[in-house]
Amino acid sequence: MAQSVPPASSHGQLTVGEVGTSVNSVPYARHEEIIRAPLTYLLNLPGKDVRSKMIAAFNQWLKIPEDKLDVIKRIIMLLHNASLLLDDIQDSSKLRRGLPVSHSIFGIAQTINAANYAFFLAQQELPKLGDARAFEIFTEELLHLHRGQGMDIYWRDASICPTEEEYFTMVSNKTGGLFRLAVKLMQLASESDKDYVPLVNVLGVIFQIRDDYLNLQSGNYAKNKGFGEDLTEGKFSFPIIHSIRSNPANIQLSSILKQRTTDIDVKLFAVGYIESTGSFEHCRRKLVELTAEARAIMENIADGRSEDLESYACILLSKLILYNRLTYKVPAAQVIHGASGGYSTAPKPRILAQQIATVRAPHLQYAT
């Protein structure tokens, strides 16, 4: 879904002495177009717009004015896409939503600059909310976001497998940060005295675990970002953490992560191993558990009004969480024990072969 950033004006001209003092010029407008190009490219790629849908869902409770709601949506959209630009560089990603990543087109330096520019474009929107506390909340959550990203990168680059507790802290900072920022800004503009942050914290963790699961299990995800991209990145995702820690003596999976492999057969081996340790099933169980927790929080928010609960549960759970669709899994691997006490895995090929066919011969629809 194409989105837009606040436009630059294109009227008038500047003298040399006026440079930097006005945005009402043709050169300024052209320069803006150049500076924002990596961001604009990303915004024009088709997406699910999950965060805007989440904001709209929460606004059924918070009921803030439309003008302020639009400002908050713009802030979150800018920050989210800025973080994606940087993520793709930091993760050496090749695809985003099925098309080349921005830095493959515009270069790393220009893409970093566009991402940083977007952070400040978002900050520039804050005064429109009319509450000085917005800047403090904005700063706090961006610090959380960078702390989470920093630890995620550190574990990957140092080949250190975190505990699940450390993972949840990282996710709360990194993924939950923008969810939390949106809801906190909305609460500033709302007359409601209820705190929705506990709910959004749970939703952030659900969203990330689901994303980690789909990265290794979804054919559609493979088409859009590449099959098993987390394995190529060397990322300690939720199923990978569980799999490694389920049998620390077996170093096969941790060794594969260090290789940053793009080899499909090696990735298939890794996915089969993760399945053999029950780690995908662990993801599904954790998502059911977290969804029940989210549901309990919503019941408390709804104060027993069943019609409200069902309405919001439908929006927040059915459209955003979708845990009940995570029933697809890799066919059970055939485990072959070797003389050394280790083992190799041979996943049954049918469904995984369909995934690989998608990866090796993707049908890409180019954004216009």
Swiss-Prot record:
Molecular function terms, GO-annotated: (2E,6E)-farnesyl diphosphate synthase activity; dimethylallyltranstransferase activity; geranylgeranyl diphosphate synthase activity; metal ion binding
Pfam families registered for this protein in UniProt: polyprenyl_synt (PF00348)
Binding site for Mg(2+) 1: D87, D91
CDD domains named in the record: Trans_IPPS_HT (cd00685)
Gene Ontology terms describing biological process: alcohol biosynthetic process; mycotoxin biosynthetic process; terpenoid biosynthetic process
Biochemical pathway: Secondary metabolite biosynthesis; terpenoid biosynthesis
Domain of life: Eukaryota
Bound cofactor: record note: Binds 3 Mg(2+) ions per subunit.
This enzyme's EC code(s): 2.5.1.-, 2.5.1.1, 2.5.1.29, 2.5.1.10
Disruption phenotype: Reduces the production of both diterpenoid pyrones FDDP D and FDDP E.
InterPro entries: Isoprenoid_synthase_dom_sf, Polyprenyl_synt, Polyprenyl_synt_CS
Keywords: Magnesium, Metal-binding, Transferase
Binding site for dimethylallyl diphosphate: R96, K174, T175, Q208, N215, K225, K235
Residues that bind Mg(2+) 3: D211
Summary of the protein's practical applications: Diterpenoid pyrones display various biological activities and FDDP E shows anti-HIV activity. FDDP D and FDDP E show also inhibitory activity of 42-mer-amyloid beta aggregation that is involved in the pathogenesis of Alzheimer's disease.
Cofactors demanded by this protein: Mg(2+)
Catalytic activity, reaction form: isopentenyl diphosphate + dimethylallyl diphosphate = (2E)-geranyl diphosphate + diphosphate; isopentenyl diphosphate + (2E)-geranyl diphosphate = (2E,6E)-farnesyl diphosphate + diphosphate; isopentenyl diphosphate + (2E,6E)-farnesyl diphosphate = (2E,6E,10E)-geranylgeranyl diphosphate + diphosphate
Binding site for Mg(2+) 2: D87, D91
TM ranges: none
Residues annotated for isopentenyl diphosphate binding in this entry: K48, R51, H80, R97
PANTHER family hit by this protein: GERANYLGERANYL PYROPHOSPHATE SYNTHASE, PYROPHOSPHATE SYNTHETASE ATMG, PUTATIVE (AFU_ORTHOLOGUE AFUA_8G02400)-RELATED
Function: Geranylgeranyl pyrophosphate synthase; part of the gene cluster that mediates the biosynthesis of diterpenoid pyrones. The first step of the pathway is the synthesis of the alpha-pyrone moiety by the polyketide synthase dpfgA via condensation of one acetyl-CoA starter unit with 3 malonyl-CoA units and 2 methylations. The alpha-pyrone is then combined with geranylgeranyl pyrophosphate (GGPP) formed by the GGPP synthase dpfgD through the action of the prenyltransferase dpfgC to yield a linear alpha-pyrone diterpenoid.
Family, per entry: Belongs to the FPP/GGPP synthase family.
Protein name: Geranylgeranyl pyrophosphate synthase dpfgD
Source organism: Gibberella zeae (strain ATCC MYA-4620 / CBS 123657 / FGSC 9075 / NRRL 31084 / PH-1) (Wheat head blight fungus)
Lineage summary: Eukaryota, Fungi, Dikarya, Ascomycota, Pezizomycotina
